[in-house]
């Protein structure tokens, strides 16, 4: 299991949220058979979505992030609740790309930077809250920093890092960080935090070296007072059920269900988020056809 921590810095003038999520990223890699670059791309997206979801208030609230960068990896979709559970998928999970000029996984090229980032908060109201911003780099962290500034009017420092073993492709570490100064935060504090960017970029490396999340944060922001206010366990968890897939089939309507019965004599649906397959026999489809008729 991973963990999310929340806290305050610099005499309570700066909000801090961080995550260690090796298991989240590795579970996603295993479920989707991800290439190394897609492990990094989806992993980063899962980490930021999980942190944002943890800020939701209601037990049934959901937050979904949709990255449409226009790159060959396709769209990335992740959903989280406020209890640390997150799930997600990437459209082209097997994509392989050469390393970038720095010798690192070319996440930016895989994701693309010509599209849009969308955040959907479903708070159980009549309509969900939807925020959007343009992609700026495809590195994901920079794109979410842009989103916080443009869509939520909250300047933020965002870091996301996933360390992937170059030999077997397994995840060695995953870490994320959101730092947000409050409106009354002094300029010198903001400057001090911005000076820590080189250290911030070492977070995944520290986690890979076995340094605990809180200790890593204190090392990064050494000299700035820090108080941790909350900690939460996290994990990759899909909440798909057979009943939910039945409702999907019913929603297709009588004509399409009848077509499945006549031509396919059954149906097999696959959950995008966890790749679990659900098979429905011809008789089961006939039962759903009856329910679809009652619903009309």
Segments the model singles out, each with a brief description of its role:
Residues 1-230:
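Interaction interfaces in information-processing and related assembly proteins
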Residues 198-296:
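Cys/His-clustered metal-coordination modules, chiefly Zn-binding fingers
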């Amino acid at each position: 299991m991973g963990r999310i921590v929340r806290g305050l810095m610099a005499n309570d003038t700066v909000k801090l949220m961080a995550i260690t999520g090796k298991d989240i990223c590795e579970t996603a890699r295993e479920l989707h058979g991800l290439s190394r670059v897609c492990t990094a791309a989806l992993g980063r997206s899962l980490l930021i979505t999980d942190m944002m979801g943890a800020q939701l208030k209601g037990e049934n609230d959901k937050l979904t992030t949709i990255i449409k960068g226009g790159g060959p990896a396709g769209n990335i979709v992740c959903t989280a609740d406020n209890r640390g559970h997150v799930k997600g998928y990437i459209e082209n999970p097997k994509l392989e790309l050469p390393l970038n000029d720095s010798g690192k996984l070319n996440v930016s090229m895989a994701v693309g930077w010509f599209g849009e980032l969308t955040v959907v908060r479903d708070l159980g109201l009549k309509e969900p809250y939807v925020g959007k911003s343009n992609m700026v780099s495809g590195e994901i962290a920079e794109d979410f920093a842009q989103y916080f500034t443009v869509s939520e009017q909250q300047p933020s420092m965002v870091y996301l890092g996933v360390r992937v073993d170059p030999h077997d492709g397994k995840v060695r570490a995953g870490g994320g960080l959101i730092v947000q100064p409050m409106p009354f935060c002094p300029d010198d504090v903001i400057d001090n935090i911005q000076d820590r960017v080189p250290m911030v970029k070492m977070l995944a490396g520290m986690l890979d070296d076995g340094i605990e999340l809180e200790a890593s944060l204190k090392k990064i922001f050494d000299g700035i007072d820090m108080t941790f206010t909350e900690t939460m366990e996290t994990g990759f968890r899909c909440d798909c059920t057979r009943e939910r897939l039945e409702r999907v089939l019913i929603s297709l309507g009588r004509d399409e269900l009848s077509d499945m019965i006549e031509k396919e004599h059954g149906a097999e649906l696959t959950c995008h988020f966890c790749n679990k397959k659900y098979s429905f026999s011809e008789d089961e489809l006939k039962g759903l056809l009856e329910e679809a008729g009652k619903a009309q």
